[in-house]
Amino acid sequence: MYELRSSNEGTVVRVEVDEGQMVAEDDEIAVLDTESGRVVIVTDVPGVVRELYVEAGYSVTPGTVVALIDES
């Protein structure tokens, strides 16, 4: 399992995927509102989203786990 982590501090504006959804490398997972503007979190690996740990309105910091992706 791959833990997709935020590299920025901000507030989640929206989540672009659902649990159980197939994703490809570079697919958008979530959008953050940061001090420097909007930032899109993309996945580095293809797979199935097994868990989402954030939703709109959540605050995240660098290292926060956003989603768990099953690469198998």
Regions found by a protein language model. Give the residues of each.
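Short beta-strand-turn/beta-hairpin segments enriched in glycine/proline and small hydrophobics
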Residues: 1-11, 28-46, 71-72
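N-proximal short alpha-helices
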Residues: 14, 22-23, 33
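A structural signal for short beta-strand/turn segments enriched in small hydrophobics and glycine
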Residues: 20-29, 57-66
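Short histidine-centered loop motifs in beta-beta connectors
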Residues: 7-8, 12-18, 50-54
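Short, charge-rich amphipathic interface segments used for partner binding and complex assembly
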Residues: 40, 46-61
